[in-house]
């Protein structure tokens, strides 16, 4: 949520956590174990930056972030979480964000132009549908 030139990105026991818009870095890294909320964190950051008019580029190998283009809605989980934090759900506004999906094949998205050398092992392995052993070579 973008309000008063601040990017609301999370909530703690002490209240909301904001990033001041003009203090945000141009690059970031979200890391963690499976199930720790990396994808949701990226999605919230991208949505909030989009609301502030800041374009974002995110590499999404599995397509988990493509739903950012769709308008969300209030779910029981969100209602419960908002109640825990004392947030008023009636003020929430749901909207999709502008998205351009790149496709190295140029068939299901905007064509992406790169060289094999610059792709990196993980992307190349996915394109070639390599198994774990083949990827490690």
Describe the function of each predicted region.
Residues 1-97:
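Glycine-rich phosphate-binding loop of nucleotide-binding enzymes
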Residues 83-137:
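Helical/strand "switch-coupling" subdomains that flank nucleotide/phosphate-binding cores, especially
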């Amino acid at each position: 949520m973008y309000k008063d030139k601040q990017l609301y990105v999370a909530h703690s026991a002490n209240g909301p956590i904001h990033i001041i818009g003009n203090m945000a870095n141009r690059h970031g890294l979200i890391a963690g174990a499976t199930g720790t909320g990396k994808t949701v964190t990226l999605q919230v950051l991208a949505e909030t930056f989009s609301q502030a008019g800041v374009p974002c580029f995110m590499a999404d190998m599995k397509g988990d972030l493509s739903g950012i283009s769709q308008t969300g809605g209030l779910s029981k989980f969100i209602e419960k979480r908002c109640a825990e934090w004392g947030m008023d759900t009636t003020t929430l506004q749901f909207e999709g964000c502008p998205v351009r999906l790149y496709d190295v094949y140029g068939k299901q998205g905007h064509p992406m132009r790169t060289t094999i050398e610059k792709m990196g092992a993980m992307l190349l392995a996915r394109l070639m549908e390599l198994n774990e052993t083949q990827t490690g070579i």
